[in-house]
Amino acid sequence: GYETLGVPMPITVYTTHQPMPMKCCIKTASGFGGCNAALVLSLPDAHLKQKVNLQATDKASAPSVCKAVVESGNMVTIRPGAVESKGTTVFSSSETDFAPFIREAYKHLGENNMKFYKMDNLCKLGYVAAEYLLKDTNYRPKEIGIILANASSSLDTDCKHQAIISKEGDKAASPAVFVYTLPNVVLGEICIRHKIQGENTFFVCQQSDTASLEDYARIVMAKGKLRTCIIGWCELLDGHYQAEFKQLNNISTIYG
């Protein structure tokens, strides 16, 4: 960070989440084609006062948020050595180390996308979980969304990227590694594969919270009129991995 161009400033880094009152935030976006943007969002004083007044009133008087009525569809869990669908093991292996296991789990599907083998480990984990979850399903691109979360972000690949720079210098940085130093890239790989054009969001939080993900999914499903939405936990770091994907189907009257 810097206050004046070219003048470095120290950045305070914490190992734990730090609560703080927020009046402004910066929303950034970047794309593989080099399209980058940053937007500053600020709460006006009037809104801050309104927020305080709203918190002081009865919750029943607060405006309601439209949420879709949903039912659970397919569920897929990936843990060391096994892939489960609705609690039933659909693939198992004596291999528990991630690299050989995930290759076997992918080949078991009968798929042959060579790009899969070039992905980083987090993308491979999410990609395979989505393959098992959406097998034999068919949705129009704008009828389906996906919302994922994890605790370690893309740290597994971030560390590999930093190790290359630390050992060989900046010029040795590999674009093939750097491109995966964002956790939402796994969403991109899944969306490309399954032609998903609905809501796609990746949250980074301390622990899995399926209830919060489902609540958020119900809001975006109602707003975007999605027929189905994938929610899930996709965590991988230092050889430890876990994926829990769940499909929510919209049964609101608009699809009755």
Question: Which residues fall in each region the model found?
Answer:
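Conserved "HGTGT" condensation-loop signature of ketosynthase/thiolase-family condensing enzymes
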Residues: 1-256
